[in-house]
């Protein structure tokens, strides 16, 4: 029988949520006021990733940030991260009971209705909806959702979970994404590939959270 008790809660609105692939980016962005962030490193063994995970968690604690570790849930549990983010394929192998018992928050990626229903049944801390627009930062097996589909999913959830929109969201697309009622916007290249990442981050913080960096 599936344990339907909820995972540890997080803020209803997570605000700006950068997803980055290095400890260097974690430190830069926490240093300019970002409060929710995800370390997404790929194609490394747990042994190879552990040092980065430890350093990222330490930075999250230092800056009192909501730091999520993508995929490496065993390391996140071992080193007491704030939270873990899992894709649908990760849900097949992760020990969700161990993550919950450790008190970690859980975020889950979804791409269409069936995956959204699966996420709701798990009762995670937040649900990510995407990808909204075409993106080059990750190979995606599904088509972009678009704003109409995002709006429908937000309405279907009826505020039961914090929500995060992700995928191809540039600065100029932020107002339209926020208008759907989503509680957070995850970005990758809008910051990491910006000509001036500091300015891009400050602009995004003001647009999404209404505060200065």
UniProtKB/Swiss-Prot annotation:
One of its GO terms (biological process) is thiamine diphosphate biosynthetic process. Its EC number is 2.5.1.3. It comes from the Bacteria. Pathway: Cofactor biosynthesis; thiamine diphosphate biosynthesis; thiamine phosphate from 4-amino-2-methyl-5-diphosphomethylpyrimidine and 4-methyl-5-(2-phosphoethyl)-thiazole: step 1/1. 4-amino-2-methyl-5-(diphosphooxymethyl)pyrimidine binds at residues 38-42, 70, 109, 138. InterPro entries: Aldolase_TIM, ThiamineP_synth_sf, ThiamineP_synth_TenI, TMP_synthase. Keywords: Magnesium, Metal-binding, Thiamine biosynthesis, Transferase. CDD domains: TMP_TenI. 2-[(2R,5Z)-2-carboxy-4-methylthiazol-5(2H)-ylidene]ethyl phosphate binds at residues 135-137, 168, 188-189. Binds 1 Mg(2+) ion per subunit. It catalyses: 2-[(2R,5Z)-2-carboxy-4-methylthiazol-5(2H)-ylidene]ethyl phosphate + 4-amino-2-methyl-5-(diphosphooxymethyl)pyrimidine + 2 H(+) = thiamine phosphate + CO2 + diphosphate; 2-(2-carboxy-4-methylthiazol-5-yl)ethyl phosphate + 4-amino-2-methyl-5-(diphosphooxymethyl)pyrimidine + 2 H(+) = thiamine phosphate + CO2 + diphosphate; 4-methyl-5-(2-phosphooxyethyl)-thiazole + 4-amino-2-methyl-5-(diphosphooxymethyl)pyrimidine + H(+) = thiamine phosphate + diphosphate. Its cofactor is Mg(2+). GO terms for molecular function: magnesium ion binding; thiamine-phosphate diphosphorylase activity. One of its GO terms (cellular component) is cytoplasm. Mg(2+) binds at residues 71, 90. SUPFAM superfamilies: Thiamin phosphate synthase. PANTHER family: THIAMINE-PHOSPHATE PYROPHOSPHORYLASE, THIAMINE-PHOSPHATE SYNTHASE. Condenses 4-methyl-5-(beta-hydroxyethyl)thiazole monophosphate (THZ-P) and 2-methyl-4-amino-5-hydroxymethyl pyrimidine pyrophosphate (HMP-PP) to form thiamine monophosphate (TMP). Belongs to the thiamine-phosphate synthase family. This is Thiamine-phosphate synthase.
């Amino acid at each position: 029988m599936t344990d339907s008790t909820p995972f540890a809660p997080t803020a209803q609105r997570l605000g700006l949520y950068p997803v980055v692939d290095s400890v260097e980016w974690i430190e830069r962005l926490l240093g300019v006021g970002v409060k929710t962030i995800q370390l997404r490193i790929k194609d490394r063994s747990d042994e190879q990733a552990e040092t980065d995970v430890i350093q990222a968690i330490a930075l999250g604690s230092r800056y009192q940030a909501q730091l999520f570790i993508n995929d490496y849930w065993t390391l996140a549990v071992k080193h007491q991260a704030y939270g873990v983010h899992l894709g649908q394929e990760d849900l097949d192998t992760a020990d969700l009971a161990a993550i919950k018992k450790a008190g970690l928050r859980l975020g889950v990626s979804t791409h269409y209705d069936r995956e959204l229903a699966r996420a709701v049944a798990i009762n995670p801390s937040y649900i990510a909806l995407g990808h909204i627009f075409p993106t080059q930062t990750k190979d995606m097996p599904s088509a972009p959702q678009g704003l109409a589909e995002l709006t429908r999913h937000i309405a279907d959830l009826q505020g039961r979970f914090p929500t995060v929109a992700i995928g191809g969201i540039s600065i100029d697309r932020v107002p339209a994404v926020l208008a759907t009622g989503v509680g957070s916007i995850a970005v990758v290249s809008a910051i990491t590939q910006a000509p001036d990442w500091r300015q891009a981050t400050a602009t995004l913080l003001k647009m999404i959270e209404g505060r200065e960096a």
